[in-house]
Curated annotation (Swiss-Prot):
This is Phosphoglucosamine mutase. GO terms for molecular function: magnesium ion binding; phosphoglucosamine mutase activity; phosphomannomutase activity. GO terms for cellular component: cytosol. It comes from Bordetella pertussis (strain Tohama I / ATCC BAA-589 / NCTC 13251). It comes from the Bacteria. One of its GO terms (biological process) is peptidoglycan biosynthetic process. The modification Phosphoserine is found at S112.
Length: 452
């Protein structure tokens, strides 16, 4: 894929009022996307169905969402696209609505786990997946072309969806087995003052759980602030205080999950992915699981021991999904809590992932700690080393020798990951080993080889 001017790996994202997250750019982006979608519609029209393409726009709870929604709507309408406004719904809800309503595309206004000062815009294809690269490239090229407007008789219409949240709630519930319920289970659900504030608590309540909800009072400014999947310690405190069985933490757009048990222990994405896969193995063979460069070595070892393949993708759920599709595997995820179950949904979904974990626990009549007890997470040690200007760490002889020595010493007892920071001139030296002391000593050997 060629270098992009505006789009990153997850759409367009930045600070509100910056070069790309402003009303003027959103208007141009909406018009550009509309033109491309209209052209695709004409080229693939079969003579049946809608006269005009339709898209759905969903958003999280940031104050800037109103501005960006209105600008996108105007641009799309000017290009002759009908718009459905779903309001505040999780990112995976937009993927679901796009697919089930047979729409041309879905648009999400969210910066996920970032603070309210940021926002972003990303697209889903008609199949509820990421846009094909050629369509994304065409939209980006069209952004820099002059704004225009179709004739009055061809303008798109916009309307608010009254049932978007209800549709999504029912979809989430449909991924939980009909022969199970959550009766007698006491949950604390933290929606991060984000997109799931009005849907996630309903999902678990309607399946029978007693739910205490936190992070469900968005004011436009408090999304992800001290709550949600980025701050599970807040949830852990609430779970202990209320004597709950489990806690469920989502992030601002509800595609990320962390969980907490009744003791306050926090479970990250690696542990939750294992909980899901272990249950799926009782239904039939699981060919493999995709993690990332940051997935704990303990998960890789445990999956190998139970006969499940494992591959690492670059960090980012987009790359995890790409590798899952390439291999035909159904399960994957990140330590951060992006979990993908392609037998349930086309994209990562925190609420649905939590339901799959709960399915495992109900089937086994086990606690979360009991269910993942055979997964041994390896201690991790990371040292950040400043990179001197002009230093090519990939060809550094001292580092190469140190890495070879460390990897020989670890041999099946851990792993080494060396990568440059994407945001600052630093080299990240990470070692996972079967005990803390070995991880620390190994990471220090790598740092010493660079004179750190």
């Amino acid at each position: 894929m060629s270098q992009r001017k505006y789009f990153g790996t997850d759409g367009v994202r930045g600070e509100v009022g910056g070069p790309v997250i402003n009303a003027a750019f959103a208007l141009r982006l909406g018009y550009a996307a509309g033109r491309v979608l209209a052209r695709e519609h004409r080229e693939h029209a079969s003579g049946r169905g809608r006269n005009r393409p339709q898209v759905v726009i969903g958003k999280d709870t940031r104050i800037s969402g109103y501005m960006l929604e209105s600008a996108l709507e105007a641009g799309l309408s000017a290009a002759g696209i009908d718009v459905l406004l779903a309001g505040p719904v999780p990112t995976p809800a937009v993927a679901y609505l796009t697919r089930t309503l047979r729409l041309a595309a879905g648009i999400v206004i969210s910066a996920s786990h970032n603070p309210y000062q940021d926002n972003g815009i990303k697209f889903f294809s008609a199949h509820g997946m990421k846009l094909p690269d050629d369509i994304e490239a065409a939209i980006e090229q069209a952004v820099d072309e002059p704004l225009g407007c179709v004739g009055s008789e061809e303008l798109g219409r916009a309307r608010r969806m009254a049932d978007a949240q209800g549709r999504y709630i029912e979809f989430c519930k449909s991924t939980f087995p009909h022969d199970l319920d959550l009766n007698g289970l006491k949950l604390v659900v933290d929606a991060a003052h984000g997109a799931a504030y009005n849907v996630a608590p309903h999902v678990f309540r309607e399946l029978g759980a007693e739910v205490h909800a936190i992070g469900v009072s968005p004011d436009g400014f408090n999304i992800n602030k001290g709550v949600g999947a980025l701050h599970p310690e807040s949830l852990a405190e609430e779970v202990r205080a209320r004597g709950a069985d489990l806690g469920i933490a989502l992030d601002g757009d509800a595609d990320r999950l962390q969980m907490v048990d009744g003791t306050g222990r926090i479970y990250n994405g690696d542990e939750l992915l294992y909980a899901i896969v272990r249950e799926r193995m009782q239904r039939g063979p699981v060919a493999g699981v995709v993690g990332t460069l940051m997935t704990n070595y303990g998960l890789e070892r445990q999956l190998q021991q139970i006969g499940v393949g494992f591959e690492r993708a670059n960090v980012g759920d987009r790359y995890v999904l790409e590798q899952m599709q390439a291999r035909g595997w159904l399960y994957g995820g990140e330590s951060s809590g992006h979990l993908l179950c392609l037998d349930c949904h086309t994209t990562g979904d925190g609420t649905i992932a939590a339901l799959q974990v709960l399915t495992a626990l109900r089937r086994a009549d086990a606690t979360l700690a009991e269910w993942v007890a055979d997964l041994r997470m390896y201690p991790q040690r990371m040292i950040n080393v400043p990179l001197a200007p002009g230093l090519d760490w990939k060809t550094h002889d001292g580092l190469a020798r140190a890495r070879g020595a460390v990897e020989a010493e670890l041999a099946g007892r851990g792993r080494v990951l060396i990568r440059a920071s994407g945001t600052e001139p630093k080299l990240r030296l990470m070692v996972e080993a079967e005990d803390e002391a070995l991880a620390q000593a190994s990471a220090q050997k790598l740092a010493d080889s660079l004179g750190a």
